Amino acid sequence: MLEIMSEHQDSLLKCKAETLPSERRKRTVEDFNKFCSFVLAYANYIPSQKEEGPWSPASSSSPNGSGASGEGSVLGGASSNMSPSWNHGTSDLHTIHTFVHKARANKSSKSMRRLSPDGALEDNMCLKDSFYESQAASKAERKKDKKLKRLSLGSGAGDSSSSGGEKRARIKHSKNSKQSKAYKKLKSSAHSESDSENGLGHREERSEHRLQVQVKEEKNEEDEEEAIREADMSSSEGETWIADEDIMVESGDDSWDLITCYCGKPFAGRPMIECSQCNVWVHLSCAKIKKSNVPDIFNCHKCRDSRRSSHKKDS
């Protein structure tokens, strides 16, 4: 039993010795240089080093050089490899410095290229200026369109207001249109004759004489037309006066200033009608009666009111 127990303890000790981890490896200058070169290559500052092998962890050694008895060989190998690693580390530092200088130079050249790629900044500024100019032009066009709309609206209102004035002007100038047209025709004929012929003196006098004669004839014709119109108007007025003789009061000296209407105004030659009940003469305008629609029986408003009041009392 004791032998079995001792064997079991020996096996446990062997397992523990095998499973015990070695001391944690410490970073060296070579590892730092490799790490820096890897970072620079990853950032595209330096070209990637394909000729170098993968980064393999080298055997490390404690700085004191003391360790367990079972690990003596490992420590011895690490101490033997220290001197070449330091030499290689100094060369790697030199290469890192050169790579950093190259990277800075490349960086500055790239920045210069970015700053001036065939006048890109000038092109951008020109594009911005053209964009702002197009915006200003569009704003100016909008303002012009608004002004044109306002002017069109104002002209429409002016046309609507001036249409009435044009109609009135046409009515006013319709009487003198014949004279002006005839006078213009005579002037044009006289000018054409005077320009076509050589003897200007006698012919101008003749043309002026003709113009005067024609103007006089036209005036006489117009006077005759006006007289005919006045005669027609007087005849029509006479007919109306004849039709109104039964309605109107006789126009004597006393009856002209006679006041019989409720409005308190005199007769003054205006047409009147007599009430069939109270025999009071009332102006047709006060009774609101047209000359064309004169009734045979007329009752003034006072007689109408008295009738209505009597009917109400009876009811």
UniProtKB/Swiss-Prot annotation:
InterPro entries: Zinc_finger_PHD-type_CS, Znf_FYVE_PHD, Znf_PHD, Znf_PHD-finger, Znf_RING/FYVE/PHD. Keywords: Autophagy, Cytoplasm, Metal-binding, Nucleus, Zinc, Zinc-finger. One of its GO terms (molecular function) is zinc ion binding. Residues 51-89, 135-238 are annotated as: Disordered. One of its GO terms (cellular component) is cytoplasm. Residues 190-219 have a biased composition (Basic and acidic residues). Residues 54-66, 151-164 have a biased composition (Low complexity). Residues 78-89 have a biased composition (Polar residues). Its main location: nucleus. Acts as a negative regulator of autophagy. This is PHD finger protein 23B. It comes from Danio rerio (Zebrafish).
